[in-house]
Amino acid sequence: GDLTATLAALQRHFFTGGDARPIIAALQNRNRILLQVRALADAGLVRVGPRGLDGLPRAQGAYASRFIGATEKSSFNLFTQNPWYVGKLAGSAKLPTLRRLIDNQQEFLVAFEEIIQRPHEQEAVLRDMAVRCLASA
């Protein structure tokens, strides 16, 4: 990731009076999807390439039964997502490792807890979170 651009975007967001919770929620949702993509890629069921995600229908055939009853769109179920969106989210660059994605999810949780404790320091909390997530990427 681009730490400088991320920090600048956070500054713009909070300059206009933004709140941290929607950012954290969006990051958690996207990260949940990437965790599932990474697990499927590591299992050899999908491949992230220049045209998005290849093999998603095959992976769905293998694992959709694990999500019985989960038919509404949700970041908890990769197979309810628009395949085009998943491909764009995964991008054509190398996916982060599963460990990095899990660590990021933990950082998002820590940041959410911190903004509850320090509601007037939301920008600083997200800035610190971004540094922790992107500096080690």
Stretches found by the model and what they are:
Residues 5-137:
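C-terminal alpha-helical interaction modules of replication/initiation AAA+ assemblies
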